């Protein structure tokens, strides 16, 4: 179960990073 938990955490972190990157790009483009 630990492996599956780590996999889910990795996916969640990847999604959060993508959201932050998009937000940063949006702010950079806006400015």
Curated annotation (Swiss-Prot):
This is Scolopendra 20566.01 Da toxin. It comes from the Eukaryota. Transmembrane segments: none annotated. Coiled coil: none annotated. Contains 3 disulfide bonds. Belongs to the CRISP family. Venom allergen 5-like subfamily. One of its GO terms (cellular component) is extracellular region. Expressed by the venom gland. One of its GO terms (molecular function) is toxin activity. Shows similarity with the venom allergen 5 from wasps. This similarity may explain why patients with allergies to centipede venom also display allergic reaction to wasp, honey bee and/or yellow jacket venom. Keywords: Disulfide bond, Neurotoxin, Secreted, Toxin. It is found in: Secreted. It comes from Scolopendra angulata (Barbados giant red centipede).
């Amino acid at each position: 179960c630990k492996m599956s938990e780590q996999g889910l955490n990795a996916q969640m972190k990847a999604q959060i990073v993508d959201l932050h990157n998009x937000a940063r790009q949006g702010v950079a483009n806006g400015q």
